[in-house]
A protein has these predicted regions:
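Ser/Thr-rich, low-complexity intrinsically disordered terminal regions
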Residues: 1-137
Length: 137
């Protein structure tokens, strides 16, 4: 089993082939590229809804999904060259029925990714918000 990402201590590489999203106010060594929203649902329910939405996408596989740690990890093959990208997600319980998520998407190979990781995360969040219709605060 791969070591799971510790979002608080994550230090981004000096390469452009990665994309990090964190909840507002999340304490991390790295500055996120984007902030994530809050959802009116428990972190466990958010994890379940995220899994159901993301797993339907082209060449996505779940390689880790743990309800105790509230962490999941997915892989997706790039469209053109079939390189593997890794997407780590942590579901964060902010209070009773209020949660958010941290996402780190990155390429395994190469230096440039033509913004694939950024586009993926933005798209997944857009689809997730549209499909789940969870109230966002």
């Amino acid at each position: 089993m791969r070591k799971q990402i510790d979002f608080s201590n994550l230090i981004l590489k000096k390469t452009p082939n990665q994309y990090l999203c964190l909840p507002k106010g999340f304490n991390s060594l790295s500055k996120p590229h984007q902030l994530t929203s809050n959802y009116d649902v428990s972190a466990r329910d958010l994890q379940s809804a995220w899994y159901k939405t993301v797993i339907k996408h082209r060449s996505v596989n779940c390689i880790f999904n743990d309800e105790n740690s509230l962490k999941s990890e997915f892989t997706q093959l790039s469209r053109v060259f079939k390189f593997i990208d890794i997407i780590s997600v942590e579901f964060i319980e902010k209070s009773h029925n209020l949660s958010s998520l941290a996402i780190y998407s990155r390429s395994v190979l190469g230096y440039y990714d033509f913004n694939v990781n950024r586009k993926r995360v933005i798209y997944w969040l857009k689809i997730f918000n549209r499909e789940t219709k969870l109230l966002i605060k």
